[in-house]
Structure formats: C-alpha cells, structure tokens
C-alpha cells in the first residue's frame, strides 16, 4: 500500500521513528531506529511495508529496498513474525542474512531472539535459492557521530531499551551492559550495533 514515505524525521524512539509529511505523523517500526539519528529533523525517504492485523495496522520501515525485501521474505516464513524479522535485520545486513540462508547456517540464525532450530530450518527450507545476493546499499551501514559523553549518559540506557525492544532477555542485556560500559560510545546507534555484535557473536 505504501512503497515508501518521504518527509521530515520528527521523532526517534527505541522501537520506531515518526516521519511527518503533509501535516501527518507516520509511526514507523524499524530494525534499529537510531540508524536514522543523523537525519533527525531532516527530510528522509523510508521504504515501508504495511502489516494489517486484527487489532492494528502497523507500518514497518527500512533504509533500503534490499532491507525491505528481506523483511518481506522473512515475514512469510512460518514461525517468523515482524518482530523477529526486525531483530534479525537490526543485527545483520540483508546480504549477511542471505549468505547465512544459502550456506544453511543454522547456528548463525539461532543467535537471533525468538529463532530456535526448528524456525532456523524453516527459514532455510523456505528461502534458500529464492533470495539473490546483491551489492549492499551503503546506507544500511550508516554511522552517526554525536557529542562525546560518559557511560552514565542516556546513550547506554537508550541502547539497552532498543535491544530490549528487539526481544533480548534481561539476562542477555545484563551481560551486554557490562561489556558496553567498558567502552566509550558517541551515539546510541554505535552502542546498539556494538551490543548486537556481542549478542550474535
């Protein structure tokens, strides 16, 4: 229904962003909303997919058509919902997911929250040979440089909220928090990416 939405990025939250266009604010769920942080209060184009449920109509948004395409593919797999698909794409690029599927790498797939061995096998069964490896869109690898701050700042707190929203448990987050506190991060996006790297390693 909505191929993409173009407008001003007016708000950022751990689970979603708000894009304002023609006086309407669209709430868009994203894999890692802080990747959009460098575009705050600027015009953006977000590739979207509308998911209709009995109790809600939800917009999901992505930085590239490749990422959107992988979300749509994952969402068709039995046992995979939008939340699990977002968690996978928050931690990996579309190409990394495609390579994992083509190589039948169940160990890689089961590192994501909500993905057990049965679901990993189903992903491979349903998608192997059906997704193409394409050149990665550089926008999926964006970094935002913000002001430096210590780890008692909201940066770490916001990053942990974003990881929790992706489905990671308190136990996993406690392990990640200790490791993140040992480093210095200049943005929430950087801290989220570091946390995801720890969680899927």
Curated annotation (Swiss-Prot):
Residues 143-153 are annotated as: Flexible linker. Residues 153-201 are annotated as: Domain III. It is found in: Cytoplasm. One of its GO terms (biological process) is DNA repair. InterPro entries: DNA_helicase_Holl-junc_RuvA_I, Hlx-hairpin-Hlx_DNA-bd_motif, NA-bd_OB-fold, RuvA, RuvA_2-like, RuvA_C, RuvA_C_sf. Residues 64-142 are annotated as: Domain II. The keyword DNA damage applies. Coiled coil: none annotated. Residues 1-63 are annotated as: Domain I. The keyword Hydrolase does not apply. GO terms for molecular function: ATP binding; four-way junction DNA binding; four-way junction helicase activity. It comes from the Bacteria. Keywords: Cytoplasm, DNA damage, DNA recombination, DNA repair, DNA-binding. Its main location: cytoplasm. One of its GO terms (cellular component) is Holliday junction resolvase complex. Signal peptide: none annotated. Has three domains with a flexible linker between the domains II and III and assumes an 'L' shape. Domain III is highly mobile and contacts RuvB. Homotetramer. Forms an RuvA(8)-RuvB(12)-Holliday junction (HJ) complex. HJ DNA is sandwiched between 2 RuvA tetramers; dsDNA enters through RuvA and exits via RuvB. An RuvB hexamer assembles on each DNA strand where it exits the tetramer. Each RuvB hexamer is contacted by two RuvA subunits (via domain III) on 2 adjacent RuvB subunits; this complex drives branch migration. In the full resolvosome a probable DNA-RuvA(4)-RuvB(12)-RuvC(2) complex forms which resolves the HJ. Belongs to the RuvA family. The RuvA-RuvB-RuvC complex processes Holliday junction (HJ) DNA during genetic recombination and DNA repair, while the RuvA-RuvB complex plays an important role in the rescue of blocked DNA replication forks via replication fork reversal (RFR). RuvA specifically binds to HJ cruciform DNA, conferring on it an open structure. The RuvB hexamer acts as an ATP-dependent pump, pulling dsDNA into and through the RuvAB complex. HJ branch migration allows RuvC to scan DNA until it finds its consensus sequence, where it cleaves and resolves the cruciform DNA. This is Holliday junction branch migration complex subunit RuvA. It comes from Staphylococcus carnosus (strain TM300). The gene is ruvA.
């Amino acid at each position: 229904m909505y191929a993409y939405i173009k407008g001003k990025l007016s708000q950022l939250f751990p689970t979603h962003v708000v894009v304002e266009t023609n006086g309407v604010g669209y709430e868009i769920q994203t894999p890692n909303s802080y990747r959009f942080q460098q575009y705050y209060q600027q015009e953006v184009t977000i590739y979207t997919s509308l998911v209709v449920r009995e109790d809600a109509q939800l917009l999901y948004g992505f930085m590239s058509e490749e990422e959107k395409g992988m979300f749509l593919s994952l969402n068709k797999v039995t046992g995979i919902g939008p939340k699990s698909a977002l968690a996978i794409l928050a931690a990996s690029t579309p190409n990394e997911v495609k390579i994992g599927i083509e190589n039948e790498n169940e160990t890689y797939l089961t590192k994501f929250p909500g993905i057990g061995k049965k679901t990993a096998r189903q992903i491979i069964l349903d998608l192997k040979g059906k997704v193409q490896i394409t050149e990665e869109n550089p926008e999926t690898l964006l970094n935002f440089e913000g002001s430096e701050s210590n780890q008692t700042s909201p940066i770490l707190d916001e990053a942990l909220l974003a990881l929790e929203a992706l489905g990671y448990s308190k136990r996993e987050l406690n392990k990640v928090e200790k490791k993140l506190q040992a480093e210095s991060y200049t943005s929430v996006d950087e801290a989220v990416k570091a946390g995801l790297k720890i969680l899927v390693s």
